[in-house]
């Protein structure tokens, strides 16, 4: 199994620190708003990575934090005249609602930064004692030049970073690239007692501290969106390795952006859709399939048209699953037929192809193609003359390959039938209103999904093909 390691910029054989176990930390949301579908891609991608590791038999200790204190949260809480904690409580609940709907597994631990303040203070004091941090007027800064390998994740040395980065000018800093690990108290902001006066932690120190206290000095995988590579993850490395003198994470993984009109989707650009908005219109399986239809290190473009196309593709899979479910309730051949023994072995070849794709840096795009190939094969070769065993095996295999992707686990029978009946009613109304264009479009859309309508003297009948 090979993983692309951002640190080395190449695919590497995955070897866990402890055989059979994986310690994985993923940077989670700042809980001041609903998360958008750019965030959702990151969460779905690393949920899939976790699921695939578990499919392979690993025990995964999966930690994803909540940033519940930062500048954006303070501003929004003040704007709404509520406390930062109240704001955090609200949007943590909203996160779980949307993440659960997307079939994202709950983390082993979801730590909140504000519950680790005493540990963060200990961490900072240790950095000061080791000469990696210094206090100035109640603020504490990390001395970036003190850490010899600063910039190794982003592939730049500190001189390049200083000349190319937009840096806040602060004459109190020893070096321009130094960053705050503790911020002194300001009016209207939450604050905690510390050896340096009242204040609050910086963003980067929170993740270093939570990873250290929950997972230990060295973890297997640290992951997040590609926008976190610098400065957030770079600073985490400096803090964590500065404190322990040990490698912070063996593998670094980063997921690419979701773009709209070839521009990164983000709250700052105000060009985003919240996950909640999309969940109101599309099933979770559609959204997950869309998110995983490209390789996780490649940006994907978002549009309603692409989601509709993904929905049509998923409908074809669901129709095949429904056909198998219906066949399993009709056939009378219990044992496997002699002619089906080799076919069962043939079906197993799809599983091997799927594993090969996923073992190659979680290539979900190619793994999904294997599932579609499997569906076409089953549609061609399995019918009412097949045995119960081969029908159930085919159905189980489809669901098995869907499981690491977090899709195809629920029966679609009732939901598909309800949707078809509603569209037939809509078409009937269009015909009554002589809106022939809409009536024809509904018929053609259903045909694209594998549903054929038959207008008879007794009304409209439909069947799957």
From Swiss-Prot:
Residue positions of motif 'KMSKS' region: 264-268
EC number of the protein: 6.1.1.16
Single GO biological process annotation from the record: cysteinyl-tRNA aminoacylation
Free-text cofactor note: Binds 1 zinc ion per subunit.
Positions bound to Zn(2+): 27, 207, 232, 236
Residues bound to ATP: 267
Alphabetical UniProt keywords: Aminoacyl-tRNA synthetase, ATP-binding, Cytoplasm, Ligase, Metal-binding, Nucleotide-binding, Protein biosynthesis, Zinc
Catalysis performed (reactions): tRNA(Cys) + L-cysteine + ATP = L-cysteinyl-tRNA(Cys) + AMP + diphosphate
Signal peptide range: none
Superkingdom to which the source organism belongs: Bacteria
Subcellular location: Cytoplasm
NCBIfam families per UniProt: cysS
Protein name (record): Cysteine--tRNA ligase
Native source species: Clostridium kluyveri (strain ATCC 8527 / DSM 555 / NBRC 12016 / NCIMB 10680 / K1)
Gene symbol of the encoding locus: cysS
């Amino acid at each position: 199994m090979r993983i692309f390691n951002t640190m080395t910029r190449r695919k590497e054989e995955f070897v866990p620190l402890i055989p059979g176990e994986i310690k994985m930390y993923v940077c989670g949301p700042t809980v001041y708003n609903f998360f958008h579908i750019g965030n959702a891609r990151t969460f779905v991608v690393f949920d899939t990575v976790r699921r695939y590791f578990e499919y392979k038999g690993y025990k995964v200790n999966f930690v994803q934090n909540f940033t519940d204190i930062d500048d954006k949260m303070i501003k929004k809480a003040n704007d709404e005249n509520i406390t930062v904690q109240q704001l955090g409580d609200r949007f943590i609940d909203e996160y779980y609602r949307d993440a659960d709907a997307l079939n994202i597994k709950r983390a082993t631990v979801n730590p909140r930064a504000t519950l680790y303040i005493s540990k963060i203070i200990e961490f900072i004091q240790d950095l000061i004692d080791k000469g990696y941090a210094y206090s100035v007027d109640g603020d504490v800064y990390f001395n970036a030049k003190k850490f010899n390998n600063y910039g190794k994740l982003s592939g730049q040395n500190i001189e390049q970073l200083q000349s190319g980065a937009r840096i806040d000018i602060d004459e109190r800093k020893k070096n321009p690239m130094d960053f705050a690990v503790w911020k002194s108290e300001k009016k209207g902001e939450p604050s905690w007692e510390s050896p340096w006066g009242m204040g609050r932690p910086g963003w980067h120190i929170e993740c270093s501290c939570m990873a250290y206290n929950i997972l230990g000095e060295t973890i297997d995988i640290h992951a997040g969106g590609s926008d976190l590579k610098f400065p957030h993850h770079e600073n985490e490395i400096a803090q964590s390795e500065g404190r322990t003198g040990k490698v912070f994470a063996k593998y670094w993984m980063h997921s690419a952006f979701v773009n709209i009109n070839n521009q990164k989707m983000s709250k700052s650009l105000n060009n985003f859709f919240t996950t909640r908005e999309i969940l109101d219109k599309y099933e979770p399986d559609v959204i997950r399939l869309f998110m995983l239809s490209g390789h996780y290190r490649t940006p994907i473009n978002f549009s309603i048209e692409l989601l509709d196309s993904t929905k049509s593709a998923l409908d074809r899979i669901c129709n095949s699953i429904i056909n198998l479910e219906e066949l399993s309730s009709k056939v009378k051949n219990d044992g496997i037929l002699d002619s089906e023994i080799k076919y069962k072995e043939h079906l197993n070849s799809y599983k091997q192809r799927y594993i090969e794709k996923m073992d190659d840096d979680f290539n979900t795009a190619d793994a999904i193609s294997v599932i579609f190939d499997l569906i076409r094969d089953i549609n061609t070769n399995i019918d009412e003359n097949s045995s119960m065993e081969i029908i159930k095996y085919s159905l189980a295999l489809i669901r098995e390959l869907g499981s690491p992707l977090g899709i195809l686990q629920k029966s679609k029978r009732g939901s598909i039938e309800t949707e078809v009946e509603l569209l037939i009613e809509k078409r009937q109304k269009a015909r009554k209103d002589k809106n022939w264009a809409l009536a024809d479009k509904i018929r053609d859309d259903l045909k694209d999904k594998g549903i054929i309508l038959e207008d008879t003297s007794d009304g409209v009948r439909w069947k799957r093909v």
